[in-house]
Amino acid sequence: MNPIVEFCVNNLASGADAAFAKLDADDSLDVIEYDCLTYCDLCATSLFALVDGEVVRGETAEELVANIYTFLEENPF
């Protein structure tokens, strides 16, 4: 089973779309887009994704991708 990375469509529109595209190309991840993840305060202030249910943030799309891979390395399944 692959790790699940979930994105909010509104956060994608705020700049996380580049992170989504990069992660979606990784066959070892299941990357999913949702209409809303109900993290509206977080969504309005930063780029983020849920990685197996845990919030991972980044100031930029590149930082978000790096933080997601770091999270996955530190939390093996």
UniProtKB/Swiss-Prot annotation:
Disulfide bonds: none annotated. Pfam families: DUF1450. It comes from the Bacteria. InterPro entries: DUF1450, UPF0349. Belongs to the UPF0349 family. HAMAP family: UPF0349. This is UPF0349 protein LMHCC_0204. It comes from Listeria monocytogenes serotype 4a (strain HCC23). The lineage of its organism: Bacteria, Bacillati, Bacillota, Bacilli, Bacillales.
